[in-house]
């Protein structure tokens, strides 16, 4: 009995560390990009997946200790997909005591009507969903719309655009919506997917499957995700280094004439970013930029199940 109690304490200790890391990551992202301001009303988009559940939980947690006042309203879009468990999210949110709104729109029917059988439906579905969420944000008086994309999503998008789109373009932590009326934020921008997965497992969130519409996964994104996971296993710290690179862009040493005036370089011009010194042999740090070994990494692997609560 004492041994079981000791194991429980150990689990609680390590999971508290995990939650603190997620809180720290979210807090840093909020501060770096000025995501949340005094008096904000944040519309938290809740899909029923691990990412959005974690985002809501961490924002609720930060709300209690933040130096500013802000409110949260959770919003789920019920798209009338066959098999969607309508009771799950209302029951969960009622238990938490969180303000929420369930928006019912038969976008599934519209997509099935417009898109021929066998063709991908994700693009049209995404546009419809985005428009409904923007409208709902206006109706609720929300000043910010929070989405649950994390660090891995951002890196995947960068590589997708490089490999398939010919652009160095990622997924910004904060942006203006395409209708020019809403600010969209991604509070999990600095969070690792594997941390989110562990947290979701520990909290036993009532996960709703994401493939109820019957659509096929984005195979290109899946290839990129598998590649990054493989790199993360074989070369610890590479993911952190790549994400750090997204925050340390040097336009003068790329090739985009819209970002840097290469034609303006003439004799007597100022040396920019070290000039050709940048091509000298650099000392590569032994430890990848942005990466720190974690004492509890192996311990957390053992704690994916059999945990009741993280306080």
From Swiss-Prot:
E.C. code: 2.8.1.-
Gene Ontology cellular component terms for the protein in this record: cytoplasm
SUBUNIT field: Homodimer.
Protein task: Catalyzes the ATP-dependent 2-thiolation of cytidine in position 32 of tRNA, to form 2-thiocytidine (s(2)C32). The sulfur atoms are provided by the cysteine/cysteine desulfurase (IscS) system.
PANTHER family (UniProt xref): AMINOTRAN_5 DOMAIN-CONTAINING PROTEIN, SULFURTRANSFERASE-RELATED
Family of this protein: Belongs to the TtcA family.
Name of the protein: tRNA-cytidine(32) 2-sulfurtransferase
Species of the source: Escherichia coli O45:K1 (strain S88 / ExPEC)
